[in-house]
Amino acid sequence: MPTDAADAGEVTATYEATETERRLTFERGDQRATVAQNREGYAMLAVREGPDGEERERYYGFDMALDHAAELLGVGPAALPVPEAAEDMGM
C-alpha cells in the first residue's frame, strides 16, 4: 500500500492507496478529515471524519473537498498540505 506524507505546521497529511480507494487524511491535534476516491479515479470525492469515519459529503472537485476537510479541522484550505501523490485526485 503506497503512502506519502506532508506537514504544514499544525496540520499533517497522509496519502495512501488501498485495494479499493485512494485516501488523503489530514490531522490537526485529535481531529481528522479524509478525502477519499475510488482507485480508478473517476468517482466523486467523499469527505469523511477520518479514513473509516462517517461520510459527510461528496464533491466532484478536489478544491471543494479540500475546503470541506479544512472546515472540519477548523483551518483555512491553504493550511492543508497535499502530498505530491495526491495532487491529481478529483474529476
Listing of model-derived features with the role each one plays in the protein:
Residues 1-91:
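Acidic, polar-rich N-terminal leader regions of halophilic archaeal proteins
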